[in-house]
C-alpha cells in the first residue's frame, strides 16, 4: 500500500530542486517580458503616459493584495502541512472552500473599482479621462486575485513545475498582448483592456490545473481529518493586514510622486524601480519555495534542521543578491540611458540608493519565510505597518523637496524598518542563524567589484556592447573573489549545482571548483531533504 501511495503521490508532489529551476525560469520570463514592455512604451509613448500606466499597475497590485485577503499564504501553508501528513480529505475540503471564497473576493474587487473609478481618476490622475482605464483595471484586479490564490494552491501542493510553466505563459502574454493592442490601436486604454483580458484567462488556466490535482487527490487513500476553515482565516488575517501594508509601502512613494509632482516624474522613477527588480528576480523564487518546505519541517518537528538550514539559505541569498545589486548600481546611468533614453538618466542616483539599501537587508527574505513557516505571522502586521508608516512619512517630507531622490530614500527606508522587526522576532523565535563573517566577506568582495566597474564605465562611451562587457567583467571579478575569499563551501554549492540542468556540465564543474571544503556538520538537514 505504501508503494502504491508513493506512485500516486509522485504525480502530485515535485522535487524542490526542479522547482527552483522552473521558478527561476518563470521569474526570468517576467523580468525579460516586463523589461521589453517598458522599453517599448518608454520609446513610443510620452513620459507622462508612461507614468499613468505605471500608476495603474501600482493600483492593480495594491488592490489585488487587499482583495486576496491573505488567502494565498494561508492556503499555501495549510495544504503543505496536510500533504506531508497524507490528510487528503482535509486538503480537498480546503481547496473547495478556497476556490469559492476567492471567486467572491474577485467579484467584490471588480465592483469596488467600478464604483470608485471616478473618484480615483480625479484624486491621483487629476483627470476624469482615466475613468474607463480604472474600470478596466478593476477586471484585471479580479483576475489577479484568482491568479494569486489558485497559484498558491499549486505551490502548497508542491506543484512547482506546473506553477512555473503557467507563470511563464502568463508573464509572456501579460506584457506582449497589451503591447500588441497598443501597436494595433495606438491608444493606451486598449493596453489596459488587453491586460484585463489576459488576467481573466490566466486565472481560468490556473483553475483548470487546480481541478486536475483535485481529481487526483480523490483517488488517494486518505485519513478522516478535518481542518476548520476558520483556522486558515485566522492564519491569513495577520498576513492580510501585513500584505496590505507591505504592498502599500512598496507603492506609496509612487502615489505620492504622482500626487505632489506629476506623472512624468513618476514615469522616470518607475523605470529606475524596474531596473532595480533585475536583482530581485534572483531571490524571488527562493521565497516562493521556502514556505512549503519549511512548513514541512515544522510539521515534522525538526527544529534543529530547520534553524541550521536557514544559515545555508541566508548565505546563498546574500552570495547571489548583493553582487548583482551592486553591479546594477555601478551601471545605473548607462542602463537608464541605453534602455530608456536620456530623459530617464536623472533616476541613476535613486537607483544606486535603492540597490545599496536593499542589499544590506536582503536577509529578511529568508527570515520572513522561516517565521511564516512556524505560524508566527502576527509579527508581519508590525513589520509591514511600520514600513508603511516610514515610507509615508518620508515620502511626504522628502518628495516635495528632493523629487525622486526623496522617493528613493523613502522607498529604501521600509527595507530597513522591515528587516529590523523581522530580525528581532527571528532571534526571539529561534529562526535567525546569520553567518556574520561570511556576509562581511561577501560585502567586501562585492564592493571591490562595484568600485572597479563603476570607475571603468565612467571613462568609456555609453553603448549597449559596453554594457555586456561590463557585466561579463564584473562576473569574472566576482567569481575570482568567490575562490580567493572562500565565500561558499561544498555543501552550499551542492544546493546551487542541484538546480543546474545536467546538460550544463561545464557550468556545474566550474561552480563546484569555486567552493571550498569544510568539515561536514550537522546543519544541512533541510538542504539534504530539499534536494
Where are these regions (language model features)?
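N-terminal membrane topogenesis motif
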Residues: 1-34, 89-96, 131, 210, ...
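Transmembrane alpha-helical segments of multi-pass transport proteins
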Residues: 32, 387, 437-491, 495, ...
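Membrane-interface junctions at transmembrane-helix termini in multi-pass inner-membrane proteins
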Residues: 143-167, 189, 355-386
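Helix-loop junctions and terminal segments of transmembrane helices
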Residues: 38-39, 69-85, 156, 272, ...
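Signature of the first transmembrane helix
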Residues: 12-77, 101, 110-114, 140, ...
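Interhelical loop/hinge segments that connect adjacent transmembrane helices in multipass membrane
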Residues: 2-16, 189, 206-250, 289, ...
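Hydrophobic alpha-helical transmembrane segments
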Residues: 135, 165-214, 385-393, 404-425, ...
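Interfacial segments at transmembrane-helix termini and the short loops linking adjacent helices
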Residues: 8, 12-13, 117-137, 263, ...
Amino acid at each position: 500500500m505504501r508503494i502504491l501511495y508513493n506512485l500516486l503521490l509522485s504525480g502530485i508532489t515535485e522535487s524542490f530542486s526542479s522547482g527552483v529551476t522552473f521558478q527561476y525560469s518563470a521569474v526570468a520570463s517576467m523580468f525579460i517580458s516586463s523589461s521589453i514592455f517598458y522599453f517599448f512604451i518608454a520609446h513610443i509613448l510620452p513620459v507622462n503616459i508612461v507614468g499613468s500606466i505605471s500608476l495603474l499597475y501600482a493600483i492593480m497590485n495594491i488592490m489585488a493584495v487587499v482583495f486576496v485577503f491573505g488567502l494565498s499564504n494561508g492556503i499555501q501553508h495549510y495544504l503543505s502541512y496536510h500533504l506531508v501528513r497524507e490528510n487528503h480529505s482535509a486538503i480537498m475540503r480546503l481547496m473547495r472552500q478556497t476556490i469559492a471564497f476567492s471567486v467572491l473576493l474577485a467579484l467584490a474587487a471588480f465592483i469596488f473599482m467600478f464604483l470608485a473609478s471616478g473618484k480615483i481618476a480625479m484624486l491621483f490622475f487629476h483627470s476624469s479621462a482615466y475613468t474607463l482605464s480604472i474600470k478596466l483595471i478593476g477586471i484585471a484586479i479580479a483576475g489577479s486575485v484568482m491568479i494569486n490564490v489558485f497559484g498558491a494552491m499549486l505551490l502548497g501542493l508542491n506543484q512547482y513545475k506546473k506553477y512555473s510553466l503557467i507563470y511563464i505563459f502568463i508573464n509572456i502574454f501579460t506584457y506582449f498582448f497589451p503591447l500588441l493592442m497598443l501597436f494595433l490601436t495606438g491608444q493606451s486604454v486598449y493596453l489596459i483592456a488587453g491586460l484585463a483580458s489576459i488576467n481573466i484567462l490566466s486565472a481560468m488556466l490556473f483553475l483548470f490545473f487546480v481541478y486536475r490535482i483535485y481529481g487526483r487527490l480523490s483517488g488517494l487513500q486518505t485519513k478522516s481529518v478535518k481542518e476548520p476553515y476558520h483556522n486558515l482565516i485566522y492564519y491569513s488575517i495577520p498576513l492580510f493586514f501585513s500584505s496590505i501594508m507591505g504592498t502599500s509601502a512598496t507603492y506609496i512613494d509612487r502615489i505620492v510622486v504622482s500626487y505632489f509632482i506629476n506623472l512624468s516624474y513618476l514615469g522616470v522613477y518607475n523605470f529606475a524601480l524596474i531596473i532595480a527588480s533585475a536583482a530581485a528576480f534572483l531571490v524571488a523564487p527562493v521565497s516562493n519555495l521556502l514556505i512549503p518546505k519549511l512548513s514541512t519541517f515544522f510539521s515534522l518537528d525538526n527544529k534543529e534542521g530547520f534553524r541550521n538550514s536557514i544559515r545555508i539559505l541566508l548565505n546563498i541569498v546574500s552570495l547571489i543578491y548583493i553582487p548583482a545589486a551592486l553591479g546594477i548600481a555601478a551601471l545605473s546611468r548607462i542602463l537608464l540611458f541605453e534602455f530608456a533614453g536620456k530623459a530617464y538618466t536623472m533616476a541613476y542616483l535613486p537607483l544606486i540608493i535603492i540597490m545599496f539599501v536593499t542589499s544590506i537587508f536582503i536577509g529578511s527574505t529568508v527570515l520572513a519565510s522561516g517565521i511564516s513557516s512556524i505560524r508566527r505571522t502576527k509579527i508581519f502586521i508590525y513589520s509591514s505597518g511600520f514600513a508603511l508608516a516610514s515610507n509615508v512619512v518620508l515620502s511626504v517630507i522628502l518628495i516635495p523637496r528632493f523629487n525622486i531622490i526623496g522617493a528613493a530614500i523613502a522607498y529604501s527606508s521600509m527595507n530597513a524598518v522591515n528587516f529590523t522587526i523581522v530580525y528581532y522576532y527571528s532571534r526571539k523565535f529561534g529562526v535567525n542563524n546569520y553567518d556574520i563573517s561570511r556576509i562581511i566577506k561577501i560585502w567586501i568582495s562585492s564592493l571591490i567589484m562595484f568600485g572597479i566597474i563603476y570607475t571603468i564605465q565612467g571613462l568609456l562611451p555609453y553603448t549597449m556592447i559596453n554594457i555586456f562587457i561590463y557585466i561579463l567583467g564584473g562576473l569574472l571579478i566576482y567569481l575570482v573573489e568567490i575562490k580567493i575569499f572562500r565565500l561558499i563551501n561544498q555543501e552550499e554549492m551542492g544546493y546551487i549545482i542541484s538546480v543546474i540542468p545536467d546538460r550544463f556540465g561545464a557550468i556545474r564543474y566550474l561552480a563546484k571548483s569555486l567552493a571550498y571544503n569544510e568539515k561536514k556538520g550537522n546543519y544541512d538537514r533541510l538542504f539534504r531533504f530539499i534536494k
